[in-house]
């Protein structure tokens, strides 16, 4: 790790020198490239520079402690050793985390889909509750939500809702929501007060950059157009502006009906299809390279990542055994759970890296 950090520091300092040269401003493309590269390693380089400074001060105080007889200087040296030791431990942990391979999708916008799974109408109602939770979370984090497609449940909620979330590092936070969410509560239609268990599945996909090559040939898809309702189902569109695209080979069906025109709906549907096909390609590559077992989300009750227990006002994330007040989380306060999941992911990566 130390050798890697030395190389990063030297590269950072070299790039900083390049950015001070007057001639670099004559080539904007080169300047932008160097500036971007410089910024990408700045956090690691600065942390390591601070670590080296703390280490130097620590060693100097150690030397004073060994050779000095003045009690006041000895006391100051001991105090500095404690301070620098604490700082070095903190910076070492920070450097380990910064050196971990970053998820290339963390800065991307996301495409989310919520479906009612087990439990019939109650599963659909719960899907609606989850969507409201994500709406509040996104509002608190200045993320923008745009509904692409929705199918209302017969008793409320959604049997399916698809939406795009845009904002800074959206995927880094919402990627942990993917999986089966289980709810335990007494449905409004339950006359004997019995607790029912239902589930909803949440899919989270990163938006695929335009420069990523995912071939979608006209002969590979079937495009249907139909009359759509407006956003939220409040107004009926009198033209066939909604678009449904079926990918013949995979059977993936994507619908977009909340854009203003058929052209825009087609573009949005193709964007979602591209993200789904890219996900399949990435999973296939991972299985080939790492021998990973493909986990298919079926919405089965046993494949749960989180349980929402209404009678006990408790939400539990089973991946990390973390519990919080359900009422608070349903108001969009997901940060504590997400922060705990991020910390757990970092710890696993550090362990795997052998730091």
UniProtKB/Swiss-Prot annotation:
Reported modifications of this chain: Methylated by PrmC. Methylation increases the termination efficiency of RF1.
SUPFAM superfamilies for the chain: Release factor (SSF75620)
Keywords: Cytoplasm, Methylation, Protein biosynthesis
Coiled-coil ranges per UniProt: none
Positions carrying N5-methylglutamine: 234
Gene3D superfamilies xrefs: 3.30.160.20, 3.30.70.1660, 6.10.140.1950
Family, as annotated: Belongs to the prokaryotic/mitochondrial release factor family.
Any GO molecular function: translation release factor activity, codon specific
Subcellular location: Cytoplasm
Function: Peptide chain release factor 1 directs the termination of translation in response to the peptide chain termination codons UAG and UAA.
Gene Ontology CC entries for this record: cytoplasm
PANTHER family xref list: LD18447P
Name the record gives this protein: Peptide chain release factor 1
């Amino acid at each position: 790790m130390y050798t890697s950090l030395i190389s990063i520091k030297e590269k950072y300092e070299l790039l900083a020198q390049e950015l001070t040269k007057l001639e670099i401003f004559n080539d904007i493309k080169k300047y932008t490239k160097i500036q971007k590269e410089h910024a990408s390693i700045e956090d690691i380089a600065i942390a390591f520079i601070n670590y080296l400074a703390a280490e130097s001060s620590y060693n100097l105080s150690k030397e004073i402690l060994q050779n000095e007889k003045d009690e006041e200087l000895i006391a100051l040296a001991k105090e500095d050793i404690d301070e620098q030791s604490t700082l070095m431990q903190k910076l070492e942990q920070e450097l380990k985390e910064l050196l971990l391979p970053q998820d290339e999708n963390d800065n991307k916008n996301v495409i989310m889909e919520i479906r009612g799974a087990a439990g019939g109408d109650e599963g659909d109602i719960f899907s609606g509750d989850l969507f409201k939770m994500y709406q509040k979370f996104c509002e608190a984090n200045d993320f923008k939500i745009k509904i692409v497609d929705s199918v209302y449940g017969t008793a409320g909620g959604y049997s399916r809702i698809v939406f795009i979330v845009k904002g800074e590092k959206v995927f880094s936070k919402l990627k942990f929501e993917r999986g089966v969410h289980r709810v335990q509560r007494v449905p409004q239609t339950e006359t004997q007060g019995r607790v029912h268990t239902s589930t909803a599945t949440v899919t989270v996909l990163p938006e695929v950059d335009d420069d990523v090559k995912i071939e979608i040939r006209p002969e590979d898809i079937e495009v249907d157009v139909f009359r759509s309702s407006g956003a939220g189902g409040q107004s009926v569109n009198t033209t066939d502006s909604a678009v449904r695209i079926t990918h013949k080979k995979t059977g993936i069906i994507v619908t977009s009906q909340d854009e203003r025109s058929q052209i825009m709906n087609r573009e949005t549907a193709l964007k979602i299809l591209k993200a789904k096909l890219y996900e399949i390609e990435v999973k296939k590559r991972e299985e080939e390279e790492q021998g990973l077992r493909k986990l298919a989300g079926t919405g089965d009750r046993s494949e749960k990542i989180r349980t929402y227990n209404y009678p006990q006002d408790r939400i539990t994330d089973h991946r990390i055994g973390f519990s919080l007040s359900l009422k608070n989380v349903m108001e969009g306060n997901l940060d504590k759970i997400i922060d705990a999941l991020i910390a757990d992911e970092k710890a696993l990566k550090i362990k795997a890296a052998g730091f």
